[in-house]
From Swiss-Prot:
The keyword Chloroplast does not apply. Belongs to the TRAFAC class translation factor GTPase superfamily. Classic translation factor GTPase family. EF-G/EF-2 subfamily. This is Elongation factor G. It comes from the Bacteria. It comes from Xanthobacter autotrophicus (strain ATCC BAA-1158 / Py2). GO terms for molecular function: GTP binding; GTPase activity; guanosine tetraphosphate binding; translation elongation factor activity. Keywords: Cytoplasm, Elongation factor, GTP-binding, Nucleotide-binding, Protein biosynthesis. Transmembrane segments: none annotated. NCBIfam families: EF-G, PRK12740.1-3, PRK12740.1-5, small_GTP.
Amino acid sequence: MPRTHAIEDYRNFGIMAHIDAGKTTTTERILYYTGKSHKIGEVHDGAATMDWMTQEQERGITITSAATTAIWAGKRLNIIDTPGHVDFTIEVERSLRVLDGAVCVLDGNQGVEPQTETVWRQADKYNVPRIVFVNKMDKIGADFYRCVEMIVDRVAGNPVCCQLPIGSENNFKGVIDLVRMKAVVWEDEALGAKYHDEEIPADLADKAAEYRNKLVEAAVELDDDAMTAYLDGVEPDVATLKSLIRKAVIGRKFNPVFCGSAFKNKGVQPLLDAVVDFLPSPIDRGAIKGIDFKTEEDTVRMPSDDEPTSVLAFKIMDDPFVGTITFCRVYAGKMETGMGLLNSTRDKRERVGRMLLMHANNREDIKEAYAGDIVALAGLKDVRTGDTLCDPAKAVILEKMEFPEPVIEIAIEPKSKADQEKLGIALSKLAAEDPSFRVSTDFESGQTILKGMGELHLDIKVDILKRTYKVDANIGAPQVAYRETITKKYEVDYTHKKQTGGTGQFARVKFIVEPNEVGKGFVFESAIVGGAVPKEYIPGVQKGLESVLGAGVLAGFPVVDVKVQLIDGAFHEVDSSALAFEIASRAAFREALQKGSPVLLEPIMKVEVVTPEDYTGSVIGDLNSRRGQIQGQDMRGNANVVNAMVPLANMFGYVNTLRSFSQGRATFTMQFDHYEQVPSNVAQEVQAKYA
């Protein structure tokens, strides 16, 4: 099947927001108005098209980013619905990596919320151009202008209004289009499918003129000719203004702001027009960087069908009907069923079996995919999230994704031998699907340990194990992922000697072991000159050091942020071996950790509590009792917002405590911020418990 749309007519975009801002509802309306969905699904009755996992429909939150394709105004939209809950940040990060643009949905009542800040930062990291949709304008307390201010205050964005609301709360009727200077009004009885232009209401004419001037001034600033004409009193026409706004969005100079109520079917079609008019195509985003597989030099791939095939796998899912499916973005070249590709990340060959175009939860078989497409592949053997699939003759490794370390863990014990077998298969599939979910075995107890980004993250994984994979298991209480490090420099000189008749073992190593910069992890370097330790034994030295990192000397937690320099050593012509140096390095490193003033580190969470004013005192008192440090508080609407840094160890079960003393009226979000040294009195308790 030949290409149906030119690559410049593609819009690969995601919808990102805080939980409950109305992201999935907005996507549902987009699918409805573009003709992909014959009935509108509502999140609150568990029928939304994009939320297709049972866990999502029950909880009313989006967990996995489902990709779907739709057509609007002759353009092909590939939409990725991303989760807004902080425990699923990894999903957002993955989808932003493969998007060209994004729509940031705000709750008209709440404005910029904690997860909005997180997603905005992630979009900055990947340089994703974005437009803003202020949703829920029909809600009590909705305030469009406050939301616009919050974009500046909270995320240092540069919002420029392209629309203004007509009315708010129950009287929200439509929007003023500042580009065309018309009022757009929706007809309630037609499920939002019908709307018409009117003249701008007289009471809003001055405000519309004021914001129109701001829009035009922001737009013409980016173009010398338009600026000159504007200063001469010539305003840009509609087509020119649109092209200037597009230029500003693609260059990330400002963020156009639109408004509506997806639930009340108002504002969605102009938002779709804005996606088409202002968000970039793959051509606008330009070449993607990569590393040449053979030479390891930097290279690029242009978004063109004529380039060598270069594809990035950004999500793996286990589908009950098709098996494992891999969501991919074709960055360059074209891909056909039956084609042989190289997984350059793992240096393994793969063959493209079945290729699917996904629409939320139904799928369409296709034979070819072209540059710019987002498709799902079934039947790949060994592909993980972030892997590159490419033409073996011109292999490339595209930029890798970065995944956060888990901060919370639970032990899981299958109830029977049959469960044990099912658990192994299920966990390997879940870990392949989600790189922020890790599985390990506790060496001492033999228990299987699940690690994740938060309580909800692990709750849902356990739920999937029980429902989808029918694994019956006992689940332990959540544990904190502590770390260990050292606080002072130590020089260690260690000799390993063993003589048992025949060839013995001999190795001497001398290290300088010192604290590394926070977050830099473990670093090993060899400063050996003159062959005191022969080159062939250096890998043995490194292996010995790395074998200690998994279990520190205080309570057996992983060791982080330590720098080790090999400065001297000695070897024996006959008795030395890589194994001898491995043993010597292991013992030397453990000694250095013990003598380097070791400390425990714990994850500190950034906590935001939104509470009615009556409960603010209780919230602050409770957070203080949890070793929290209050960072500040401000008002959001008529609610008080308390920001604090609190150790994760003290946040278990917080949701129930908060619910009980606020009668369910206060809410909170938390996300990992950094690791910090555990106070000595608490450290003693932790060591007593784990050592």
